[in-house]
Amino acid sequence: MTPNNNNGAAIVVTDTGKDITGAITDSNFTNNKAHFSGAVDICEGKITIKNSIFVNNSAEYCAGAIAVDSQINKPAVEIINSKFDSNSAEYGGAIYNYYNLTVVDSTFTNNSKDTIYNFRVANLDLGIKTFTDLQNAIGLVRGTLTLDSDIAMTDDEAANFKDGVAINKNIRIDGKGHTIDAMDLGRIFSIGEGFTVTLTNATLINGKAVEGGAIYNDGSLTLSDVKLSDNAADSYGGAVFNNGHLVVGNSVFESNDIVNRGSASVDYGGAAIYNWYDGVLTVSGSNFTNNIKNYKNGDRLVGAIATIGDATISDSYFVNNTGRWGGAISTAGYLLAGDDVNTLTVSGSTFKENGGLYGAGIFVAGSDFTVSDCVFDKNSAFGKGDMTPNNNNGAAIVVTDTGKDITGAITGSNFTNNKAQYGGAIYICEGNIAISDSLFENNSADVEGGAIDIGSAINNPVVTVENSKFVNNTPQAIHNSKELHLGIETFTDLQNAINLVDGILTLDSDIAMTDDEAAGFVNGVIINKDIVIDGKGHTISAEDLGRIFSIGEGFTVTLTNATLINGKADKGGAIYNDGSLTLSDVKLSDNAADSYGGAVFNNGHLVVGNSVFDSNDIVNRGSASVDYGGAAIYNWYDGVLTVSGSNFTNNIKNYKNGDRLVGAIATIGDATISDSYFVNNAGRWGGAITTSGALLAGDDVNTLTVSGSTFKENGGLYGAGIFVWGSDFTVSDCVFDKNTASGKGNMTPNNNNGAAIEVTDTNKAIAGIITGSKFTNNKAQYGGAIDICEGNIKITDSEFVNNSADVEGGAIDINTVNGNPEVSISGSKFINNSASYGGAIVNVKDLTVRNTEFVNNTPDAIFNYV
């Protein structure tokens, strides 16, 4: 016989399959020894041991005194009024139980390594009814402690269990469906550091403590099929406070509470679970309902689950939980030192009808996070009590400002019927956040961002949204004031993105119109909303298939840091604007219109800053009755145009003097242009700028103001730099160099006037000022620099050097058949200008000259007709 099978040195009740009974009474078992069960080994039958003593029995492996064990049968043993002293074994110093054991009114002293080892599948009834009984039983049992009745804390023992039953050993407690009730007298369990505890199939109620109303865990705790309800903590962890490792599975947390509602400096919470700094939390298949009682928005509380340590939550259900920062879950990595962050992972879970001011579903404050395959439905963030409604954000998820460098992913999730002031479903203030494969439907915000609101006064969140669907969110799907990426590659993508987003739309790739979508975008992407589009340096190409943008009346649009190319339309090849449009750091090149506005046609308000217009064109070259043009910009009758710091180059391609075209910028409405650069633009009436107040009714005129700008090497028959036709104008601090008005093609050279500026006949009563400007090396037939045919024109503090005219007025020609110009010149210089007549000036009308210097003009300075 091998020693491994040596059992029961005193008594063995072996396996036979018979239904037997046995009684051991008034007996003493001392100094017995075996490999298994030092004194008694019971493998079958209903056996009663009563009024017996077991002293100094031992087993090498298990059951120093008694083993209740069988590989075949299911023995049931009851031990009554017996004593176990100084028995020993590796497992179960006194008793090892594998099946059914009841112990009544018995005492255990000095047994080792433990008193009772109860196997996981076994049932052990120790008659536990009070917290004292429970504490004693935990002291006795190793393995699994089973409960066979409900347990309640009594008033008499409350003082001893303020911190709960202490568990400082590895143990599994099987509640067998019973309830442990602390009666609001104290905590239920405190689990020590370094110990592994499992609690299963039990209900814990009415626990109350400063932290962790039901459980305070410093060890490694697993809760399986446990219900925790109506527990409360003064500050943190209404049901559970975790400072160790906590695993929760298939459990319920209901109506747990936080007593103190916080202050300006302290935020309490975690009514279900508070996972502390070093805590690690895992939750699966569990329900969290109605946690935080009687919440008011003035209460400074965080979510049903609050976590500073790492947390993983899966396949769980959160309903009707409340808190100021996170009704269901709050994660607070911002409390960690330096750049450290914690991680929250949530998957396969449902958040429904939770409430809170910020993130009624999930509140993220300085944490990396992943939310996948979740449902957020009917969560709400609304102000009441002493909280104004203006601050209620993100009914489903809030990612708030903390200054931490965090990342977040939201994927495969549904957001429906959520409601807040800002960000009906999601509000994002920081981090690099990716949202993909998700549905946003019927979410609403009272102010902005029906589905998503992206904004911060402190940080610069970057948000990417891909492969997601937005349906019936109000007032719009997305409001963005920071950086948003939507994976836009086609015009259809761009139109959809604009329809989704309010605030700022960010482009993260080049965009091109495809042949398949061209028929739908002949007039371009329609913008009928206020929006900012940040191109991030990317290019939008219409591929000569249609216009790029059409902007509706009454809407304010900003386009920045983008390139628009190959747009084509009847008017406004790249942009047709009826609204209020700002172009900043935008390049428009190789766009074309059939008639007006090769790049932009403006019928609203247009502001252009630090932008480039290059090689834009007009396809039709006009007729005797129609003058087309504005290859860069055509500013229509009611248009208001402001341009600053921008370059206009090479607009109008392959110009011929027979082409009836007006300048790169053509304006009928008012226009202000400053600090800009015009080079190598061409047109018949105004190569660079044409202003046409003559087209306005009656005596009305428009106004052109040009300052601090350079006009170089522009070409045209009349006013290669600026052509003025019935407009008030001011030109100040500008440079006009090497502009030419010369005839070619079928145009005779006799009519080529004013290479820099032409003020032509219209019979309008106009006024013009030219001041502080330089005119050098300009050349024309008449008026090498300026030709003036009408208006009250004042020229002051300007220089005219090396300008020339083939016929007359090397610098200025004042001459007309129909008009009556009145010109005054003061404080100016005319040097080295030349013409056949009037090397500097020819005057046929009314000229006044004061304090002006003439040097080396040929053949003379002024030729004045009588």
Regions found by a protein language model. Name each.
Residues 1-6, 31-34, 56-58, 62, ...:
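Surface-exposed loop/turn segments connecting beta-strands in extracellular beta-rich domains
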Residues 1-3, 10-26, 33, 41-51, ...:
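Surface-exposed loop/turn motifs in large extracellular/passenger domains
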Residues 8-10, 37-39, 63-67, 92-94, ...:
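Structural detector of coil-to-beta-strand junctions
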Residues 35, 90, 99, 114-117, ...:
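Intrinsically disordered, low-complexity repeat/linker tracts enriched for polar/charged residues
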Residues 43, 187, 261, 300, ...:
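Arginine-selective low-complexity/disordered segments
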Residues 127-144, 486-507:
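N-terminal capping/linker segments that flank leucine-rich repeat
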Residues 145-170, 178-180, 184, 505-530, ...:
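N-terminal extracellular ligand-recognition/capping segment immediately after the signal peptide
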